[in-house]
């Protein structure tokens, strides 16, 4: 980190997601700042960790489907599986703020309490027609698979640039068998990796999640919040920060920068921001004085997302994305701030479609429980094709679902069920609905799910025989198209993301999933929180030695031995 050390006393946060909220908490608690000196500008007040009644989202900036014909039910664009073992910065953050649903508990205690009473143990991780529940504990490696994966695990941090611009497909180009293993089916759907994704990022995951590699088939290392992540994590942060006097200004898009003119082209000082009102289109200029830090979340995986409903597919939104556009403008001025096009100009590598399904009774839920033989809250069920569907003429996962512990929302009624699912490759053709997933309505996605369940139904009877009753029980199913959902995994070089504290920056820091941090893997609340923590400590003058210590299981002999044994199961 080569940023110029300049302690500030005020901050402007561009983006109101987890990483910037974390930065604000650390500025207040460890930097001893006054909350009134922190101002957030964002298009919404939740970032990617959202979740709520459909009506809460219909008028948000990113929803282009107006008017929605059906606004009943709930929606969450995505979901998060936590891991206490590695998400140490997240748990430190949540221990600093009170829960909004459990009096007397911190948000971390709330999650630990719920998780201790509802431990994850998935017994139907992979399912396939003709086989039902697959014994996924057998990872299916051959010796070439083991050799190449071991090379990733043993590659030191200092050599990871050898994987600059190397995709997973390229890394395993002489070993197509890897993509036919139970390991790959589970890894791609647990973390949303694709064959086009970065081998460099896969290496980081193998290092930081090496302990979970040894028990991936049951997801026993997965920890979950009591409710959706908005109500269990983001809302407590908002309430705490508002109580500290922090200002949140939403429906605002930061459109452009004003930088100080300096003789050196890599000296970065923000002097002003051009901000547009997302509803009126009016713009204003906000001055940034010398005592103000600018902390910017440079890219969001939910940028340009769109919603459909039960009878309407989610439309494609071709926007580059508001946060990525602002990042791109910064890179046009300074050469050491990364390459946003690597992440936001290749939808073929980054897009997927999710859905949130709400029912008025538990008929559908009970059918899923019967077929998968496990209670809600344990599952990430992935349905493996019975015929080749990939460019390599191989089988792959058609779709995946998460059956939450109920209720998943605090306002959810006792008779209601909410479940979530996604299609990692949205342009593949449906098996039971003859169109690409991206073109499907919420009803058609439900029909596709019933079809996939019917292939693995052990009987007696079959869910397909009750298709009408199950469909009639659905009050809504909200498809969400996310063009950049896996953008953070896109093939890249290490230099394609700016450092949290860029060299020669006097007041600008980057946070979130598109900021480069040593060792940290992305698409995790861990990396998001840590980036905010680093930015906060820098601008508050807190020594970096005070950062939460990151465990290195990849350097623990016992864990490595356990992983080696797992490879030969």
Curated annotation (Swiss-Prot):
FADH2 seems to be the active cofactor and is produced through the reduction of FAD by NADH. The active site is at residue 205. GO terms for molecular function: FAD binding; oleate hydratase activity. It is an enzyme of class 4 (lyase). The keyword Zinc does not apply. Pfam families: MCRA. Optimum pH is 5.5 for the hydration of linoleic acid and for the dehydration of 10-hydroxy-cis-12-octadecenoic acid (HYA). Its EC number is 4.2.1.-. The addition of NADH or NADPH highly increases catalytic activity, likely by reducing the cofactor FAD to FADH2. The hydration and dehydration reactions are strongly inhibited by Ag(+), Fe(2+), Cu(2+), Zn(2+), Hg(2+), and Fe(3+). This is Linoleate hydratase. The lineage of its organism: Bacteria, Bacillati, Bacillota, Bacilli, Lactobacillales.
């Amino acid at each position: 980190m080569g940023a110029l050390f300049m302690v500030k006393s005020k901050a402007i946060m561009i983006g109101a997601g987890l990483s910037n909220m974390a930065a604000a908490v650390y500025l207040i608690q460890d930097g001893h700042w006054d909350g009134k000196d922190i101002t957030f500008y964002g298009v919404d007040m939740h970032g990617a960790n959202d979740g709520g009644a459909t009506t809460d989202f219909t008028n948000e900036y990113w929803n282009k489907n107006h008017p929605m014909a059906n606004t009943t039910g709930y929606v969450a664009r995505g979901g998060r599986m936590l891991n206490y073992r590695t998400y140490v910065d997240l748990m430190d953050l949540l221990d600093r703020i009170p829960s909004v649903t459990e009096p007397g508990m911190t948000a971390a205690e709330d999650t630990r309490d719920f998780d201790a009473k509802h431990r994850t143990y998935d017994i139907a991780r992979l399912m396939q027609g003709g086989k039902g529940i697959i014994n996924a504990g057998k990872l299916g490696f051959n010796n070439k698979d083991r050799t190449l994966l071991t090379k990733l695990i043993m590659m030191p941090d200092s050599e990871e640039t050898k994987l600059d611009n190397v995709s997973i497909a390229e890394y395993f180009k002489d070993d197509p068998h890897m993509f036919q293993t139970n390991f790959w089916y589970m890894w791609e759907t647990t973390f949303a990796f694709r064959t086009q994704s970065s081998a460099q990022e896969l290496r980081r995951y193998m290092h930081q999640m090496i302990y979970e590699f040894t028990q991936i088939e049951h997801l026993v290392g997965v920890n979950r919040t009591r409710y959706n992540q908005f109500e269990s994590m983001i809302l407590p942060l908002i309430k705490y920060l508002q109580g500290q006097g922090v200002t949140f200004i939403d429906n605002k898009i930061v459109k452009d920068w004003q930088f100080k003119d300096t003789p050196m082209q890599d000296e970065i000082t923000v002097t002003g921001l051009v901000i547009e009102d997302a509803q009126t289109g009016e713009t204003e200029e906000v001055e940034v004085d010398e005592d103000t830090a600018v902390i910017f979340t440079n890219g969001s995986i939910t940028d340009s997302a769109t919603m459909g409903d039960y009878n309407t597919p989610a439309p494609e939104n071709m926007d580059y994305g508001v946060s990525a556009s602002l990042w791109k403008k910064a890179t046009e001025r300074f050469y050491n701030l990364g390459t946003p096009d690597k992440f936001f100009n290749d939808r073929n590598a980054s897009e997927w479609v999710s859905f949130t399904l709400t029912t008025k009774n538990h008929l559908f839920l009970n059918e899923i429980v019967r077929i998968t033989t496990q209670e809600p809250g344990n599952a990430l069920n992935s349905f493996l094709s019975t015929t080749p569907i990939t460019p390599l003429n191989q089988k792959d996962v058609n779709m995946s679902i998460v059956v939450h512990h109920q209720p998943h929302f605090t306002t959810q009624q006792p008779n209601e069920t909410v479940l979530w699912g996604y299609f990692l490759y949205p342009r593949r053709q449906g098996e039971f609905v003859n169109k690409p997933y991206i073109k499907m309505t919420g009803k058609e996605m439900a029909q596709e799910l019933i079809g996939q369940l019917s292939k693995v139904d052990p009987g007696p009877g079959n869910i397909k025989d009750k298709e009408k009753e199950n469909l009639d029980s659905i009050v809504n199913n909200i498809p969400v198209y996310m063009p950049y959902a896996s953008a953070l995994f896109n093939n890249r070089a290490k230099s394609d993301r700016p450092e949290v504290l860029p060299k020669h920056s006097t007041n600008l820091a980057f946070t979130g999933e598109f900021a480069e941090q040593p060792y940290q893997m992305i698409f995790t609340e861990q990396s998001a929180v840590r980036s905010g923590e680093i930015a906060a400590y820098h601008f508050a003058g807190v020594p970096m030695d005070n950062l939460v210590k990151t465990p290195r299981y990849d350097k623990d002999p016992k864990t490595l031995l356990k992983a080696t044994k797992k490879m030969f199961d």
